[in-house]
Swiss-Prot record:
Record field: pH dependence: Optimum pH is 9.0. Activity is stable from pH 6 to 11 but decreases sharply below pH 6.
Role noted for this protein: Plasmin-like serine protease. Has fibrinolytic and fibrinogenolytic but not plasminogenolytic activity. Cleaves after Arg and Lys residues.
Regulation of this protein's activity per its record: Inhibited by phenylmethanesulfonyl fluoride (PMSF). Not inhibited by EDTA, EGTA, beta-mercaptoethanol, indoacetamide, benzamidine, aprotinin, pepstatin A and trypsin inhibitor.
Keywords from the UniProt entry: Fibrinogenolytic toxin, Fibrinolytic toxin, Hemostasis impairing toxin, Hydrolase, Protease, Serine protease, Toxin
Single biological process term from Gene Ontology: proteolysis
Protein name: Fibrinolytic enzyme
Temperature sensitivity of activity: Optimum temperature is 60 degrees Celsius. Activity is stable from 40 to 80 degrees Celsius.
The organism of origin for this protein: Hediste japonica
């Protein structure tokens, strides 16, 4: 299933990426 494959591929790495993103956003807010 193409959609499931794509979601899996995006979601797999993006779990770690999500935490990185949050970390980056928090850092960005604090640096202002």
């Amino acid at each position: 299933n193409y959609l499931h494959d794509t979601v899996g591929r995006l979601w797999g790495p993006s779990r770690a990426g999500l935490l990185d993103g949050l970390d980056w956003m928090v850092g960005d807010v604090q640096s202002r």
